[in-house]
Amino acid sequence: TQGNTCGGETCSAAQVCLKGKCVCNEVHCRIRCKYGLKKDENGCEYPCSCAKASQ
């Protein structure tokens, strides 16, 4: 979930805590998105969430 503290930083909802560091979540789903998957400020993809045209 968003806001998890991990080794002194806060992970986004698209990240998981691994060995004290926020890393991109490796969960993927089989959906097609016109504009690709939604990404956080670190470039990590949110699982099964489509991006909007403006991203």
UniProtKB/Swiss-Prot annotation:
Cellular compartments annotated: Secreted
GO cellular component, one term: extracellular region
The entry's keywords: Disulfide bond, Heparin-binding, Protease inhibitor, Secreted, Serine protease inhibitor
PROSITE patterns on file: ANTISTASIN
MF annotations from Gene Ontology: heparin binding; serine-type endopeptidase inhibitor activity
Disulfide bonds: C6-C17, C11-C22, C24-C44, C29-C48, C33-C50
Superkingdom per UniProt: Eukaryota
InterPro entries (UniProt xref): Antistasin-like, Hirudin/antistatin, Prot_inh_I15_antistasin_leech
Domain Antistasin-like positions: 24-50
Marked site: Reactive bond: R30, I31
GO biological process, one term: negative regulation of coagulation
One matching Pfam family: Antistasin
Annotated family: Belongs to the protease inhibitor I15 (antistasin) family.
Function field: Acts as an inhibitor of tissue kallikrein, trypsin, chymotrypsin and neutrophil cathepsin G.
Protein name per Swiss-Prot or TrEMBL: Hirustasin
Source organism (scientific name): Hirudo medicinalis (Medicinal leech)
